[in-house]
């Protein structure tokens, strides 16, 4: 009997595949695209840099001049008490957010908006960046990290620089437990070894010259713990006919 695909099992919404979103620090997005940004710029100070269990990149807590606090993706080389700017007249410095039409060609950018004002949708993983290739009247061409050329609305915002946390994948997990916790934080299931791939001493379905259970996979509900694998107390198996 076949197995359900992971995407099918995730769709049921069981606790195994449910993301622990109650641990997340909050929504990481740009502030609203208001008159302050459309006609000038707004300055903010980085008051903290925190870790969000739900993402790979560090998150900066920014307090703006108008008293507003926002969580934004931290760029490389940023530090607490640094200033960042948001708006059409902001300078071209790492961490500053501007409309694509105001950013020079060849500049590395990240957290690009798909539509103006949506808060940022593309290039948000640690260590990633996209390159602004060329400007046109009604679109801006950007080379994504995958190498794909994608057209964006010139009024969509992006942040200058590279997302912090680069080189994350170069550090090995070393232990299966570390891998387990990294997957669990994002609502993913740790991989397990199949019983038919084991030796006979390790699993009731193990052993043999090829990978097959070698015996019926139905088992009594009253079987001992080490034997209770497969279809437990199944009334029937196989397809309905």
From Swiss-Prot:
Keyword Ribonucleoprotein tagged: yes
One Gene Ontology MF term: rRNA binding
Cellular component terms per the entry's GO annotation: cytosolic large ribosomal subunit
Domain of life: Archaea
Residue span of region Disordered: 200-241
Family statement: Belongs to the universal ribosomal protein uL2 family.
Record's subunit section: Part of the 50S ribosomal subunit. Forms a bridge to the 30S subunit in the 70S ribosome.
PANTHER family: LARGE RIBOSOMAL SUBUNIT PROTEIN UL2 (PTHR13691:SF16), RIBOSOMAL PROTEIN L2 (PTHR13691)
Protein name, as recorded: Large ribosomal subunit protein uL2
Gene: rpl2
